[in-house]
Swiss-Prot record:
This is tRNA 5-methylaminomethyl-2-thiouridine biosynthesis bifunctional protein MnmC. It comes from Magnetococcus marinus (strain ATCC BAA-1437 / JCM 17883 / MC-1). Residues 1-240 are annotated as: tRNA (mnm(5)s(2)U34)-methyltransferase. Its EC number is 2.1.1.61, 1.5.-.-. Catalyzes the last two steps in the biosynthesis of 5-methylaminomethyl-2-thiouridine (mnm(5)s(2)U) at the wobble position (U34) in tRNA. Catalyzes the FAD-dependent demodification of cmnm(5)s(2)U34 to nm(5)s(2)U34, followed by the transfer of a methyl group from S-adenosyl-L-methionine to nm(5)s(2)U34, to form mnm(5)s(2)U34. The gene is mnmC. One of its GO terms (biological process) is methylation. Its cofactor is FAD.
């Protein structure tokens, strides 16, 4: 029996479990078992899979979206996955969404699955992909990309209120209404209705009167069916009377609605943003063509010889902290999958110390650790003595230790992501042209296309590709120094205001370390001298190292003579840009009175440039944020559930700066 754990500060707890003598998992919190001890799989199949008319319900659909309230052990998911893989169309896609307020850990999941031996391969895949108990959305890709599992960790009603999806079938499987009333509230039923379409089916084990009344009030037609075993009845239903619901996203940020599904997509840029997007879209079944002006992927800002992949924790629960937590755990999962076949994406050595930059920063980082409530295998505090011992150099202060973070080889990573993507290198796109049937892409000599959609992932030069969109990112030059490795035995990365990577082997076989980096605004994109390294920039980062960590800095005789410079795409509010590109003139007309506080219900829907999308403004955090944005773009184009909470979608939306300006009274 595991000890009961208190909810963490993000509002999510973990499952408190006891195990009966027959190995049935039991929840003391809800005084109930997770499944029937002798016939759990049979009962779940009867109540839930047969309740939504599986497999017939998905056999004529290229995409099927199923959602569950109460993931629990994941037994319903495993049974659904097993049946879907055996009966779905050859090119079908399954999207499975599940809410869970008290997730189990990996060991408990595996133990709960042990009685169902025929599900062992699916169980192993689920356990391996299982995220830590951190609040928010966690999307995982299974079955070679044919199945996405989107886990919503947190209270059911509030998590579903953040969801953007169209659900075809529901499993209502929380603990009994008398033991877990929050899972069966009118607020939750309203979210079920909002997320459903005409004809959406539902199935549940309970026929409680409050549940039936709540669902009928939301437009569902219900009927009782014979229960399983000693249970007399179970519940089945169909949404036959959809009700109008207030959107969970303001109209000026509402996702675009396409009349026809996207089949082909062109992606401009083979840095980490474009590569991650291409990978995710390819796995979603889209026809992907990538264009890159250089001869190989990862040639500009994503071409550094070693790049740090590390989380960003914030002192308090915030949009910033929640977004970067979601991005970190998504990227960690993707990189683990890639490393199974291409271990070279990681440089040797794992683990990163984010050292406090001052005594005040000690308190800030400790508060960030407390509010994140991350498990220690992902974040823990090291005092100065421990940090100094582990990193092999005297450090004035402790910091946050991230055991799973580390140094990546960005160009190898980009190449791995693009391994099966059709790509045109040394092909500089200079103009995008909308056509009645899509988009054509033009170089100075020829054109390509048409494509249903275009994703601009061109970094700092993105605004030049379609000026009408008024993409608001700015360019910032960054320069890093490449030094001979001072301590080859130190295998950990260090962030101290600047950063120092662990040693890696360069193309000549020499052990080197990267010391970074500078930030310099670059206003003139026609001035290509940004790629030239400046001695004063080398001096600046070396001086910062020596002032902060003099004993470490003294291991080098002076500033580096080698390095690398590139342009980053940055944003004034330090948040990235993601999503459909807007028609700015239509926004200025339609939302001219936003500053008057007009009600949301009276506002016109967003006007987008049809089929044109952006991943940009990633700054120096591309390795952290690009994988999540790739998955989001794949969902947006293919019609899957968006793995981003609604308020985070609004926070990264390309229209946000314009909308903020329109909300201010004119001078």
């Amino acid at each position: 029996m595991s000890k009961q754990q208190a909810p963490n500060t993000t509002g999510i707890g973990t499952a408190d479990l006891q195990w009966h003598s027959d190995e049935t998992p039991y929840s003391p919190r809800f005084d109930d078992i997770y499944y029937a001890p002798t016939h759990g799989a049979e009962e779940s199949t009867h109540v839930f899979l047969e309740g939504i008319n599986a497999p017939a319900c998905w056999q004529q659909r290229p995409h099927y979206t199923l959602a569950e309230t109460g993931f629990g052990t994941g037994l319903n998911f495993l049974l659904t996955l097993d049946l879907w893989l055996a009966t779905a169309p050859a090119h079908g896609r399954l999207h499975y969404i599940a809410v869970e307020a008290y997730p189990m850990d990996q060991a408990a999941l595996a133990r709960a699955h042990a009685p169902f031996a025929w599900l062992a391969p699916h169980s192993a895949a689920l356990v391996q992909a299982w995220p830590p108990a951190v609040a928010g959305f966690h999307q995982r890709s299974l079955a070679q990309g044919r199945v996405t599992l989107t886990l919503l960790f947190g209270p059911a009603a509030s998590m579903l209120a953040q969801l953007s999806a169209t659900v075809d079938g529901w499993y209502l499987d929380g603990f009994a209404p008398s033991r877990n009333p929050e899972m069966w509230s009118d607020t939750l039923f309203a979210q079920l209705s909002r997320l459903s379409r005409l004809g959406t089916r539902l199935a549940s084990f309970t026929v409680a009167g409050t549940v039936k009344r709540g669902l009928r009030a939301q437009g569902f037609t219900l009927h009782k069916a014979p229960g399983f075993g000693q249970k007399r009845e179970c519940l089945r239903g169909v949404l036959e009377n959809p009700l109008p619901h207030k959107p969970n996203i303001p109209p000026w940020y509402a996702p675009p609605q396409r009349s026809e599904p996207v089949s082909s997509v062109a992606i401009i840029g083979a840095g980490i943003a474009g590569a991650a997007c291409a990978y995710a879209c390819r796995r979603a079944g889209l026809q992907v063509t990538l264009f890159e002006r250089h001869a190989q992927p990862g040639a500009e800002a994503s071409g550094n010889p070693s790049g740090l992949f590390s989380p960003r924790l914030t002192a308090g629960v915030s949009l910033d902290g929640r977004f970067h937590a979601a991005a970190y755990f998504h990227a960690l999962d993707l990189y683990a999958q890639l490393a199974q076949h291409t271990p070279e994406i990681y440089h040797p050595g794992r683990g990163l110390l984010q050292m406090a930059e001052s005594e005040a920063d000690v308190q800030r980082l400790q508060q960030a650790l407390f509010h994140s409530a991350w498990p220690p295998q992902h974040a823990q505090w090291w005092d100065a003595a421990t940090a100094s011992q582990q990193l092999g150099t005297p450090l004035p202060r402790g910091g946050l230790w991230h055991a799973q973070a580390g140094a990546l080889n960005p160009s190898v990573l980009c190449a791995a992501l693009l391994a099966d993507v059709t790509a045109h290198y040394q092909t500089e796109i200079v103009r995008l042209a909308p056509q009645p049937e899509g988009w054509t892409l033009h170089t100075a000599q020829r054109h390509y296309g048409t494509f249903d959609a275009v994703v601009i992932a061109a970094g700092a030069t993105a605004p030049l590709l379609y000026p009408e969109a008024e993409i608001p990112n700015t360019a910032v030059q960054g320069q890093l120094s490449i030094l001979p490795a001072a301590n080859p035995l130190n295998q950990h990365a260090l962030v101290f205001g600047g950063y120092l990577t662990p040693p890696y082997q360069d193309e000549q076989g020499q052990l080197c370390q990267v010391l970074g980096s500078t930030y310099r605004p670059w206003d003139d994109l026609s001035d290509c001298s940004w790629s030239e390294c400046q001695p004063e920039a080398h001096q600046l980062v070396w001086q910062q190292l020596n002032e902060t960590l003099p004993q470490l800095g003294q291991q080098w005789l002076g500033p580096a003579r080698q390095g690398r410079a590139a342009l980053r795409a940055a944003m004034k509010d330090h948040f990235p840009l993601f999503g459909p590109l807007i028609n700015p003139s239509a926004y200025r007309t339609n939302y001219a009175t936003l500053y008057q506080g007009k009600r949301v219900s009276l506002a016109k829907p967003a006007v987008y440039i049809d089929g044109l999308y952006l991943i940009g403004g990633l700054g120096s955090r591309g390795l952290l944020t690009a994988p999540l944005f790739g998955a989001c773009m794949a969902a947006l184009l293919s019609g899957g559930p968006l793995p981003l909470e609604a308020d985070l979608w609004c926070a990264v939306h390309p229209a946000r700066l314009l909308v903020r300006s329109l909300k201010k009274p004119p001078l």
